[in-house]
Amino acid sequence: MAIFKSISSISNSTGSMGSSIGASNLDGFVSNDNSISCFDGCCGGGLGGWGGFNGLGGFNGGCGGSNTNIINLDIDIGRRRRRCC
C-alpha cells in the first residue's frame, strides 16, 4: 500500500471524486480533523468518508465497503505522474 502525502484536488475521469487531504502520514488510519474526503458524494462523519477504521481501502464508513474509488485514485495518480510536496 502506497503512502500518500498531501493529496489535494484529485479528480478521476468522471469528475465525481474530489478530496482535500492534509495528512502527513497515512498508515492504515487517518486522524486529521482538517481533512475533507468525499468519494462519489458519500461523505461520512469524521473518519467515515476515508475508510473508517478499516484502513485506506475499505471505505466501509463512507459508501458501504466499496474499494473501487481507491483503485481509481491509484490509476489516476499513475496516469498523471503527479508529485506533490
From Swiss-Prot:
Domain of life: Eukaryota
Family: Belongs to the UPF0512 family.
Protein name: UPF0512 protein R
Organism: Dictyostelium discoideum
